[in-house]
């Protein structure tokens, strides 16, 4: 995911992803479009322009582009002339799904119809959202959300309460779609932690507390009625 759906409204929006400037906007059908924020004519920022008749219009010379990146209007040459096919915008495939704008960063022919998401959250939930910039590399942020040893120290008054410093396992299952972690921290009374075999048996009786779904969403199951979702945006 790149951003929340509610952030993309009537005006074009500029964002930087992967070290490149992009413009995000909605076409006449309210479909979200992600394109390079640079007019191929003379490099003006399209995010400073407007959306007119379902086309994003350059603020410099009025060149207008559709959701596929094709230049549909070049006012200076007149409406009787078809603009050059070289006037195209880089337009990656995106989806507006479950409150997020998702980017398919690969071959469009291999894209799935819907992005990966948590089935438990598909319906029936009330929620609020916050945005937060973390001054760390994306991989470190994800790694931190799968670490259970820091809980009694960093989150001592919430999910880490009880000073359960002894880490049993944790028991982890993974496949090509996700990583699932069962948190079994205990108070340290000098006992030995349970074996992974014992933890595996215990895991069959409950849901994993932590689930990371590739490439960038994470779910914390706090209780049956309270969950925390994090979307990692590069």
Language model feature labels by segment:
Residues 3-122, 227:
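Rieske [2Fe-2S] iron-sulfur-binding domain
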Residues 31, 109-234:
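C-terminal catalytic domain of Rieske-type non-heme iron oxygenases
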Residues 1-4, 137:
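Helix N-cap / beta->alpha transition motif
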């Amino acid at each position: 995911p790149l951003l929340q759906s509610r952030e993309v409204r009537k005006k074009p929006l500029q964002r930087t992803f992967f070290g490149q400037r992009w413009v995000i906007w909605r076409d006449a059908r309210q479909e979200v479009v992600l394109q390079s924020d640079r007019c191929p004519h003379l490099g003006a920022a399209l995010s400073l322009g407007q959306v007119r008749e379902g086309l994003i219009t350059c603020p410099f010379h009025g060149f207008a582009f559709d959701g596929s990146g094709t230049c549909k209007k070049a006012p200076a040459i007149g409406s009787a002339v078809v603009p050059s096919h070289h006037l195209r915008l880089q337009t990656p495939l995106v989806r507006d799904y479950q409150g997020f704008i998702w980017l398919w960063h690969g071959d469009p022919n291999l894209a799935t119809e819907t992005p990966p998401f948590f089935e438990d959250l598909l319906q029936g939930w009330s929620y609020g959202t916050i945005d937060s910039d973390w001054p760390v590399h994306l991989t470190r942020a994800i790694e931190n959300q799968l670490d259970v040893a820091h809980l009694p120290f960093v989150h001592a008054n919430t999910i880490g309460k009880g000073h359960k410093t002894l880490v049993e396992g944790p028991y982890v299952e993974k496949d090509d779609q996700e990583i699932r972690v069962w948190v079994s921290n205990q108070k340290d009374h000098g006992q030995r932690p349970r074996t992974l075999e014992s933890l595996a048996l215990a895991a069959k009786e409950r849901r994993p507390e932590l689930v990371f779904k590739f490439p960038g969403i994470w779910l914390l199951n706090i209780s049956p009625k309270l969950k925390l979702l994090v979307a990692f945006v590069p």
